[in-house]
Amino acid sequence: MIDPWGSAKLEYQDLIENFGVRPFSEVLDEVPEPSWLMRRGIIFGHRDYERIISAMKKGEDFAVVTGMMPSGRMHIGHKMIVDQLRWYDRMGAEIFIPIADMEAYSARGVDFEDSRRIAIEEYIAGYIALGLDLEKDNIHVYLQSENLMVEDLAYVLAGKVNFNELRAIYGFTGSTSMAHMYAPIIQVSDILHPQLDELGGPRPVIVPVGPDQDPHIRLTRDIAARFRDRYGFILPSSTYHRFMGGLTGGKMSSNRPKSAIFLSDTPEEAEAKIRNAKTGGRETLKEQRELGGVPEECIIYETLLYHMSGSDSRLEEIYESCRNGTLMCGECKNNTAEFIRKFFEELSVKREKALPAARRILEG
């Protein structure tokens, strides 16, 4: 069972083999101007992405839905969501960004005022600082608890969902709170409500998620089919991205502070975390030169894979130099630490400047 509230590392191939997700490589060549996350295999799987490709090529309306979980600090692994949203913005999407304050309350015990504060200071400011203009007309940011359209739709959708179904998907038990059990229905409504007549009617919707969120996607698609006659819903599409590895193993997570580089870290803190991170190097320089490194097991290389945008040629050069033993870990780590320090020096200034806009988006 995949646990959407856990933080265990998943075997991505199992998702493809056992849950009906298709390899993204099958559609990559059809994607107009694919992003580096697509080209590098970070986005590894999809459901029905052909619909999104068709909409982009024909210039037809489509929407993107991806939420913020305001229960902890925003870390560098979250940046890939912003990078995807910036790409979809360029491709003409209408973007919906629910702030999951109801889920944060029910699943993680975060009260609503804290959710609002975390959303503003960590996530909205972070998204703006990373280059996404959240005040554009085609981008909609909202709190779940304040969106009556989402809440009303969720109530209707819940009429065709029962406890046994939720138990089978999420492992709910008799001790699970009603609020926690209702949270997935709110999320289903987040994903489906862009297709309501009030917002333009049925259209393709893409939901970029990590593999641990696939239970939500499967439930959403099942419920969309049940309400097709009433609303005309098109089954939402989804893409699946690999988790950035944590500094201590597993996936990077806000709930495990030692695993993450946070966007609110100072440049010095971010640099120090990179310098102390595990590499894929051998035990001695002699072995490194003779056997080469293992970039697939290196958080330093992974940092570049996820965050060094632009051409892939420089990244390929680093990979090959590591594998053939001509690039030593010390040099690579030093270069990456400098890259991260510069990135965070610029980001810290942008985050501070973004706070007034972040407050304005939620508080008016």
Curated annotation (Swiss-Prot):
Gene3D superfamilies: HUPs, Tyrosyl-Transfer RNA Synthetase. One of its GO terms (cellular component) is cytoplasm. A motif ('KMSKS' region) lies at residues 251-255. It catalyses: tRNA(Trp) + L-tryptophan + ATP = L-tryptophyl-tRNA(Trp) + AMP + diphosphate + H(+). Its EC number is 6.1.1.2. It holds the Pfam family tRNA-synt_1b. It is found in: Cytoplasm. InterPro entries: aa-tRNA-synth_Ic (IPR002305), Rossmann-like_a/b/a_fold (IPR014729), Trp-tRNA-ligase (IPR002306), Tryptophan-tRNA-ligase_arc (IPR020653). Keywords: Aminoacyl-tRNA synthetase, ATP-binding, Cytoplasm, Ligase, Nucleotide-binding, Protein biosynthesis. This is Tryptophan--tRNA ligase.
